């Protein structure tokens, strides 16, 4: 979208880390805030994570496997980043992070809270994608830990992103009319839950989620909704959307939504930007 954007993360200082940095630079993103960590050459001290994805076809769904063990970012601590410099001197206007990072380790929980609190100190807008992954939280305390951490984080969030499972597992809200396995979203119940969440967390300026109905691995129906100022706006429906690669669709939605909110302050337009960007 042409915005000045940087990434706050940590990489193992080796050839793989430099390759990752190169990919980020190709996207026009500033890498000067990356924390480079020394490594021993075989990953015992720290390493860079890997992701494997089977794209799927027809009735065979996409399957992802993330290898996050012992990664540099999971070992990063609050003192590894100068948040006063980032949000104070540099004047970053928006911070986006999420539950996958928070769940990486005990240190990650502390670091994301430190970042968010520093951002709020300097008036930076904070968005957070709950992105509940039970397998990740299981190693550091399970759903109880997920709720403890995310309920604290939620106090500082301006724009919260999450689906029905995210709000149920991470923040303890219930959606009326949903089945126990959350296989199908009761949209009316979800809208009611959003209003309850906004009452619990009056700091929420917007709450959003994508709407996806999987037809096959390569054909989905796609849309999104966004709550703001007591109203709920629904994006255009993308029926029968053909998909080459679904990985990152939610992140693309978030970036489009953020761009729309930053540049127009119009939630209806922003959720349409998000849905269109996610579709692309």
Language-model features: locations:
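Alpha-helix C-terminal capping segments
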Residues: 1-5, 26, 260-264
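Conserved N-terminal subdomain of the carbohydrate kinase-like
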Residues: 4-99
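Hydrophobic beta-strand scaffold residues
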Residues: 5, 31, 126-128, 161
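Anion (oxyanion) recognition and catalysis
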Residues: 25, 113, 117-121, 154
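Charged helix-capping and loop-helix junction motifs
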Residues: 80-81, 109-114, 141-151
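A short helix->loop->beta-strand "cap" motif at the edges of active sites that frequently abuts
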Residues: 120-125, 201-205
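Conserved phosphate/ATP/ADP-binding segment of small-molecule kinases
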Residues: 133-231
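Conserved post-catalytic alpha-helical subdomain immediately downstream of the catalytic base
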Residues: 217, 233-280
